[in-house]
């Protein structure tokens, strides 16, 4: 975990910390040697996670992290490879639908929230995510003003390290123009205070925005809970429905990992992706 932090992989270090806490809770905070990790213990841990109501993907998530730590210990010569994870599930199941329709998006965009500035802000962040090909909230939070130059928004995905380029459209500028100029180096009003921890500001805003989006979703009687992540899925789903090539969007994010779609998007000629994005934005 300390190594991940040194490498700047803060989010990954946080997920490893969460997994460590989970396994420590299972072991009642007793220390466990790598040599003690065997198939029976791992099977018991899997049953423990399921017994606490975790979904198959959450159970698999913790197992994959624990397996990665174990394999690292094997590589470093700290233990022998005994394959303790051979009998537990470490794949990813397709989750429930996380996308909304084009009509739903139009309803969100057309909602009169002029007297509800907090909901209006959450709606703007959701739309900005959609406008920018499903940009994740953490990447939105850390967009710098200097990332926007000559009509092109360029940024590096914090999760994958992929460099992405997006043609700046009028709808994006309209959202930026609604809010006072940020006193920090960042473009959007998510991280706004120089004297407060930036990471904490991001996580607080993510929770607040998702809470507000759920209210908007209930107001419109949407079929699923509205969150920032729905914006990511919806762009890909709508793109697919409008015959944008699968090579551009990689199966509407119905893949085994979130990374795949962004890798596809980043590896293509950006003009192809920009045209695809413009095609989708023109529908609204």
Question: What residue spans do the PLM features occupy?
Answer:
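N-terminal core-binding DNA-recognition domain of tyrosine recombinases/integrases
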Residues: 2-11, 20-96, 111-114
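Basic, Lys/Arg- and aromatic-enriched nucleic-acid-binding interface segment
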Residues: 83-137
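Catalytic-site neighborhood detector that most strongly recognizes the C-terminal catalytic loop/helix
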Residues: 99, 157-161, 253-278
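Short, basic (Lys/Arg/His-rich) helix/loop patches that form interaction surfaces
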Residues: 110, 114-117, 210-251
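Conserved tyrosine-mediated DNA breakage-rejoining catalytic core shared by Y-recombinases
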Residues: 142-178
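DNA/chromatin major-groove-contacting recognition/catalytic segments
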Residues: 165-170, 174, 178-179, 266-284
């Amino acid at each position: 975990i300390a190594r991940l932090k040194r490498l700047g992989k803060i989010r990954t270090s946080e997920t490893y910390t969460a997994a460590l806490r989970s396994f420590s809770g299972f072991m009642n905070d007793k220390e466990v040697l790598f040599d003690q990790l065997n198939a029976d213990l791992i099977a018991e841990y899997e049953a423990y996670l399921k017994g606490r109501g975790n979904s198959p993907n959450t159970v698999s998530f913790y197992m994959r992290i624990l397996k990665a730590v174990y394999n690292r210990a094997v590589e470093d010569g700290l233990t022998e490879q005994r394959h303790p994870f051979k009998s537990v599930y470490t794949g990813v199941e397709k989750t429930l639908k996380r996308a909304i329709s084009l009509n739903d998006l139009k309803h969100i965009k057309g909602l009169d929230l002029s007297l509800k500035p907090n909901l209006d802000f959450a709606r703007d962040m959701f739309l900005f995510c959609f406008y920018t090909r499903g940009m994740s909230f953490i990447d939105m939070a850390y967009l710098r003003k200097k990332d926007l130059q000559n009509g092109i928004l360029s940024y590096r995905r914090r999760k994958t390290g992929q460099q992405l380029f997006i043609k700046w459209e009028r709808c994006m500028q309209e959202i930026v123009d609604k809010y006072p100029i940020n006193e920090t180096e960042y473009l959007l009003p998510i991280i706004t205070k120089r004297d407060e921890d930036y990471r904490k500001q991001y996580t607080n805003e993510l929770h607040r925005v998702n809470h507000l989006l759920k209210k908007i979703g209930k107001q419109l009687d949407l079929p699923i809970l509205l969150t920032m992540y729905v914006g990511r899925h919806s762009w890909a789903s709508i793109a697919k429905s409008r015959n944008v090539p699968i090579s551009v969007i990689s199966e509407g994010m119905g893949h085994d990992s979130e990374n795949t779609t962004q890798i596809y998007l980043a590896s293509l000629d950006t003009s192809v992706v920009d045209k695809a994005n413009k095609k989708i934005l023109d529908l609204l």
